Amino acid sequence: MAAAAAGPVAAASRLFRSFSDALIEQDPQAALEELTKALEQKPDDAPYYCQRAYCHILLGNYSDAVADAKKSLELNPNSSTALLRKGICEYHEKNYAAALETFTEGQKLNSADADLTAWIKRCQEAQNGSQPEVSASQRTHQSKIKYDWYQTESQVIITLMIKNVQKNDVNVEFSEKELSALVKLPSGDDYSLKLRLLHPIIPEQSTFKVLSTKIEIKMKKPEAVRWEKLEGQGDVPNPKPFIADVKNLYPSSSHYTRNWDKLVGEIKEEEKNEKLEGDAALNKLFQQIYSDGSDEVKRAMNKSFMESGGTVLSTNWSDVGKRKVEINPPDDMEWKKY
């Protein structure tokens, strides 16, 4: 049943309508498509362009991301977030001088943004061709942090068991035969992982996701073959076709067999019991409703929010699918078109 978005629901609906980072990270491709539709209706919306740039970054489409970030800055020159995203793309395209200039401009607008400071440092190090020294504590972290991996017919999935990491503190780069990950740990130390992969992957279809309990890296296989190990020089003459393991017991970096189903269950239980407050709790609730819903539920939610300007939330497709959803703001608010 359609209902006016009031109180917590109104807050949640605003989070959805603004395409928050957390929602985009759930499914960057779906968010990209929705933002493209939204921009058809509101072609001068700077935040929409900025968030679509984030979608492109997560999908590895850096040239498209730069274009959207620039458009966002044309509409709102004072957006430090748009400058951050433009700079990240320039950095990944190895245009370090331009990236440094962009990050510096963003820092002038928001000197308290730690992400801009960190990226400025990375650019300076890249320009100088220097690598930061590895401290003793950093080497200790490197030895303690473990990763596991498993595979499906279409993907190889690596999970870094690192908790409470901010998404902007994680940088993952894919190439056809290599994976490189750099993580700024909560302690302030860096963790790096570099792998020479056994078989090729499709970099542009490989992604990563930062969760509160782990970092999940998904590498797209070009063909459905079984990886006998994660690293190597491609010295397997005749790769075997992929056949799923019955018990889901997969190889890991620590060279012993792990019951992945049990591990995933433990992580999901920990995520489920995580205590969130305020907007974070509302955001998680809204993500859960959307991710667990059927295709009809998702269509109903998208249609009702877009047509009502974010004032109505409905999961009933049989109702909203056959009519235009009218604007219906909460009793204590007045709708204004800008």
From Swiss-Prot:
Compartments, as annotated in UniProt: Cytoplasm; Nucleus
In-chain residues carrying the UniProt-annotated modification Phosphoserine: S254, S304
Single annotated GO MF: protein-folding chaperone binding
Boundaries of every SGS domain copy: 249-338
Protein name, per record: Protein SGT1 homolog
Crosslinked positions (Glycyl lysine isopeptide (Lys-Gly) (interchain with G-Cter in SUMO1)): K268
Stretches that traverse the bilayer: none
Keywords noted in UniProt: Acetylation, Cytoplasm, Isopeptide bond, Nucleus, Phosphoprotein, Repeat, TPR repeat, Ubl conjugation, Ubl conjugation pathway
Gene: SUGT1
